[in-house]
Amino acid sequence: LPSAKRLAERYGDRAPLSLVMGGLHCGTQVPLEDGMKERIRGHWARVHEVTGQPFDEAFFERASFVYDTGPSCRAVVAARRVAPECALPVLERLHQAFYAENRDITDEGTLVALVAEHLGLSEARFGEIYDAEETLLETYGDFELARELGVRGFPTLIARKDCSLEVLTQG
């Protein structure tokens, strides 16, 4: 996300950024097992070394946490429906809440409260947008587009010029 933010700040007037949600662990219904927690811990350690991103490791003490990214993807799409320029800041806020603050952003109430506050909307109003069928369909559309583009890791930055696409970074 830091590279996407820098690109948006530096080139946004000439090369607008479109945020597409990929659904990394969307629809997961099984709690994380210890082996998966260790893989995630290792990944987080590497990310921290490279980016300085803080992580709250209390996350790994959750006994029956189901790591479903679908709700957070839907929240970002809902924010994008409110104001497209808010999608990246909302995604950043959700990452901060999850990784650095150990907030459960798989919980709809937590998500709605975080994003509504960030957008300056009432929870009721943002909840309506989040729950709308159009938001769900747009979220699934994002997942399909990511698959069509061949995205295999997150985040992925793809540059488009005319009709050609080039992967700049992946994962």
Positions of PLM-derived features:
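C-terminal cap of thioredoxin/glutaredoxin-like
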Residues: 1-11, 15, 93-171
